């Protein structure tokens, strides 16, 4: 009997039984022992709930406009490369938390502490690879980033690549960039063209190279279901980023921040601040740097936060 014939016959028998008043009762089979199939693990109900998405410190998955950052900049080797290295990681955590608290009264949004750590350091000598850039091994940075993460400190890894492409160096630190609260900074001052040397020429980068990094970070965010990733671009003169108007700032996975690195008198800093905003794509946020030694004087929190537009990221060097 075909499948259709059996279905029709079954329906007819059921109709006859119902019409005759016969009660049809479904009997459950007696309970027996659980059947275990080797190699197959049946998940508990709770295991079927998808894991919660990772969030940024302070909550949420988009960086701005719901928060600002205050950061210590430098390298763990010591104070010569910035304020971060003036103390150990625990001391830096205490210090940057205090700095962030000083800025909070001047911001309606939460001000979160951060580190900007130089991961690759511009070098006066070419090194064995001829690239004028010293790569800090990931294993040296791992305990620092772990400690910062445990303390709720956002970390930005800064690249000073010499003759190396930014993307090549960024990939070295992918294990950290795959974390939800680690961002990236590109420092074009130290991106050399063939034949150039640090402190002889000021480096530069084209938007096409920056966009390779944007695409890489966006893909990383998608693959690991991460919150939005911060990409900081350092600049203090227009020639440092060529075709800047073509920087891809429209990817929702990446928030691009232009870090104005001008130093000197208040008038000089404000001139740099204004000049760098000319022709800036509207999706790019502005960041500010305070120098302890080169600024005369160093801006106070109140002075810094009266700058327009109000910076989303303030670093100390």
What are these regions (language model features)?
Residues 2-28:
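Secretory targeting and sorting signals
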Residues 29-90:
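N-terminal module-boundary/linker segments of secreted carbohydrate-active enzymes
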Residues 53-62, 93-109, 169-179:
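Short amphipathic alpha-helices and their capping/turn segments at secondary-structure boundaries
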Residues 65-124:
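N-terminal-biased segments
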Residues 68-74, 113-117, 155-159, 180-187, ...:
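Hydrophobic faces of well-ordered beta-strands that scaffold small-molecule active sites
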Residues 76-78, 119-121, 161-163, 188-192, ...:
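Active-site-proximal loop/turn and secondary-structure-junction residues that shape catalytic pockets
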Residues 102, 110-190:
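Substrate-binding cleft of extracellular glycoside hydrolase catalytic domains
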Residues 200-316:
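Surface-exposed substrate-engagement region within the catalytic domains
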């Amino acid at each position: 009997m075909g499948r259709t014939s059996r279905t029709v016959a079954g329906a007819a028998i059921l109709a006859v039984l119902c019409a005759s008043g016969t009660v049809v009762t479904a009997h459950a089979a007696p309970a027996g022992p659980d059947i275990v199939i080797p190699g197959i693990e049946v998940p508990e109900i709770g295991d079927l709930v998808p894991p919660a998405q990772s969030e940024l410190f302070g909550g949420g998955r988009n960086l701005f406009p719901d928060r600002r950052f205050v950061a210590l900049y430098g390298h763990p080797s010591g104070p010569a490369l910035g304020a971060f290295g003036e103390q150990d990681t625990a001391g830096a955590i205490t210090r940057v938390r205090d700095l962030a608290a000083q800025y909070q009264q001047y911001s309606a949004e939460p001000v979160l502490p951060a580190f900007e750590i130089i991961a690759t350091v511009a070098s006066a000598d070419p090194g064995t690879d001829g690239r004028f850039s010293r790569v800090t091994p990931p294993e040296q940075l791992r305990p620092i980033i772990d400690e910062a993460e445990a303390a709720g400190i956002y970390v930005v890894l800064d690249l000073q690549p010499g003759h190396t492409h930014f993307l090549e160096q960024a990939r070295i630190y992918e294990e950290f960039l795959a974390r939800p609260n680690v961002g990236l900074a590109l420092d074009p001052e130290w991106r050399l063209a063939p034949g150039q040397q640090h402190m002889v020429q000021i480096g530069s980068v084209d938007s096409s190279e920056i966009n390779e990094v944007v695409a890489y970070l966006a893909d990383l965010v998608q693959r690991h279901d991460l919150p939005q990733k911060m990409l900081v671009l350092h600049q203090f003169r227009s020639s440092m980023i060529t075709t800047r108007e073509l920087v891809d700032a429209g990817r929702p996975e990446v928030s691009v921040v232009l870090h104005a690195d001008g130093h000197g008198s208040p008038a000089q800093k404000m001139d740099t601040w204004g000049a760098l905003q000319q022709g800036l794509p509207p999706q790019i946020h502005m960041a500010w740097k305070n120098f302890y030694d080169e600024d005369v004087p160093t801006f106070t929190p109140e002075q810094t936060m009266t700058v327009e537009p109000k910076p989303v990221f303030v670093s100390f060097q």
